Amino acid sequence: FRRAALIFPCARGISRSAGAGIPGNPDDHVLHGIERRENYVQGGCAADTVWCAASALLELFPMAARRLDYLGISFGGGIGALALPWDERFHRAHLNVPSFGHHPLRLALPGVGSGEAVRRYQQRTGRAWATLCSFDAAVAACYLRIPVHVAAARFDPAVPPPGQFAIYNALAGEREGGLARPARLAGPGAQSEILAQDGGVVCVNTERSW
C-alpha cells in the first residue's frame, strides 16, 4: 500500500474485542444470538468491522474519504458483502474467499469451518433459518453497486465454494473475479494483494475457519 491509511478492526467477541458475553470460539461465536434476528452477532460484526471502522478511519484521516476501499478475507469477505451495500462511503472492495453466501446451500454442505456448527444447529433445532435469511451475503450482494473484485476458491473445506461464487454472481455493480487458494491452505505468508493510493482501506482478516 502506498500513501494509504489502513485500519484493521476486530469484530466483537474476537481477539482484542473479546468480552461482552460473546464467546470467542468460532463454533460458539457464529451461533451467538442466532435465536433472534435482532440479537444475532453477525449484525454487530457488520457494524464493527465495516461501518464503525470506516468512521474511525475517516475521523483520523478525513482526506481518505475520496478513496475509501474495503478488503475482507473469509469472515471479513462475507461481512463486507453483508454491510457494504448500505454504506455509500466506500468506493471499491476486494472479497477473498467470502463466507456467508447462499445459506440454503451452506446448510446442505458439510464442512470443517464454523459454518458446520450452524448446519448442525439447524439440523438439530430447525430454528436457524428464520435468522439466517436476513444475513445472506449473496442476497446482500444484489444491492452492492461499487466495483468489487472477488477471489473465490474452487476447493475450500471451511467456506463452501458454491456460496463464494453465489456472492460473485449476485453482485449488482461492476465485478471482476479470480480463483483463489484459501490462505489457510496456502501456508504461511499467503495473502491477497490490492493496490491503494492516496486513500483509506478497511482490512478485515481472520486466521480462524469460518
List the predicted regions and their residue ranges.
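Hydrolase active-site cap/lid region
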Residues: 77-125
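Histidine-bearing beta->alpha loop at or near hydrolase active sites
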Residues: 174-200
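Gly/Ser-rich "nucleophile elbow"/oxyanion-hole loop immediately N-terminal to the catalytic nucleophile
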Residues: 29-74
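Cap/lid segment of the alpha/beta-hydrolase catalytic domain
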Residues: 5-47
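Short beta-strand/loop motif that positions the catalytic acidic residue
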Residues: 144, 150-152
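Active-site nucleophile elbow and catalytic-triad environment of alpha/beta-hydrolase enzymes
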Residues: 125-140
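Acidic catalytic loop of the alpha/beta-hydrolase fold
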Residues: 154-159, 185
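Short alpha-helix in the alpha/beta-hydrolase fold that links the catalytic acid
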Residues: 146, 160-169
